[in-house]
């Protein structure tokens, strides 16, 4: 659900804006232009987070590129109800240009869907063309948000995490277990990923706490809350 667009005054929309602000503040010592969103496993809400974060950044006046880098099971196009006939995979394969494949959803938000599912997603995402594409995008957009596959499922997020400035890990209390979340964190740390924070979804708000273990919690509706690391 695109709550930032459909319910702009809801608590959860404000939570995404807070996440946006925290990411911006985390760039005080280092540029935080390329941001990877992933999860430990499927169904945890990483694509929903990517889309709403992109909307929140765009509404603040920043130029944003949202990339669907889940070349195995893309979903960004479904959330925005746009075509996925051509996209990132086609651009990287040299079949089309970015300008022809991208969609300007609003004045500040540009979306590049995943495109045709390739036979070699990991190789495509780790290619020199992908690195060159991201480098070119940095010269055009203030923020580039990459919606990546789940960490434990495939190696794609680990590959992409070496190309970005920061990683946000999405974890669902109703889907992921503690060990899966820990394993995802370990896999990212093994490639020296810069994990700047996490988003915790589907939480029982009856047992919520304002502070816990060095994390801030931001509560929203529909049993969802966003959590962000304190200063590291």
Predicted feature descriptions by range:
Residues 2-17, 21-22, 28, 39-44, ...:
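P-loop/Walker-type NTP enzyme "switch/lid" segment
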Residues 6, 40, 171-175, 198-208:
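G-domain G4 guanine-recognition motif of GTPases
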Residues 59-65:
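Helical hairpin unit composed of two closely spaced alpha helices linked by a short loop
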Residues 139, 153-174:
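Inter-motif core of Ras-like GTPase G domains
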Residues 182-232:
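Hydrophobic micro-sites
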